[in-house]
Structure formats: structure tokens, C-alpha cells
Amino acid sequence: MRYVIVSVVKGPAGNFNNNLRKEVFEKLGAKSSKLPAHFTIKAPFEADDISDLDKVLQDFAQNHKAQDYKIKGYNHFDNRVIYMDVHMSKECKILHDELIEELEKLPYIHFKNHDYKDKVFHVTISSKKIQKIYDELWEYVNNIPCEFDCKFDNVSVFKWEDNTWKLYKEYLFM
């Protein structure tokens, strides 16, 4: 089975991202992820049994408090991805890194630079074959203010089923 571990962005920032992704698809044909607004904790991986992951995440969530982060403005990876820029507080970054340390103890979780501790935290707007419309898309989103106070208050595991990501389980911090 294929899984991905994310933190779903909720509240005004999550709604903003979900609506903006729909808007840029309708106006410019820019496609995005099938996941809700999120930042990635662990990129997709394969596993047959994730009962040990379930226990790790339950224990972690029960013993950690939600932390603040900000989303402010936009950024991009070359002309391939446009995203909302995430600015982690010191406490939020520590929470993330402690979570990574727990996850990497599992035998089927292998991190790469792009999803390890020093990843570029971001909430994707569009990432599917946007090179031809990149300039227009970049100009479009930059005319829309983007600034939100957020909480890293959940870890959500999604499972790939029926050609889409479906929520397997959400773990809420204290």
C-alpha cells in the first residue's frame, strides 16, 4: 500500500489554499495535488502494515502540544511548483524534527533531503506541468494577499486508493 504523511492546514489558510487551487485550475488550467491543503512530513512511501506507525503517531500526538507557524507570501521551485511560503516558529521546527526522529526509527520510512528536517516547508498551489503557464500563474497568485497564522496541530496519514488519496487517520496534538 502507498501512504503519505502530512499536516493538514486547517482554518482560513487551508480554505484559502483549497479555493485558490480550484481558482487557478478553472482560470489557467493549473493542476494540483489530490490532497487537501497541507505541508508534507513524509513523501509517499510503500508499506504493507503500518500498525507500528499508528502507535508511534498516537504516542507522539498524545505527548506533544500544537505549535504556531505562519504562512506569508508565495515562492516557487524553479518553474515547476508554486506554493504558499511556510515560516516555522522555533518551537514548531523542534516539534517537526522530533517527529521526524520518531518516524525514521521505522524500517520502511526512509527520508531524502527534500522531506527530511531541513526541507523547504510549503503549501503547494500548483505543481502539475505548469511550465508553459508559469509566468502567468506566478503573476496571478502574487496579486492575491497571502498571510495567515496557523497551528501545527495534526499529523494525517493518507492512503492511495481508487486513484486518489483518502484519509487513513488523523492524529491531533494536545
Features from the language model and the residues they span:
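Short, exposed beta-strand-loop hairpins at the edges of beta-sheets
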Residues: V157-W160
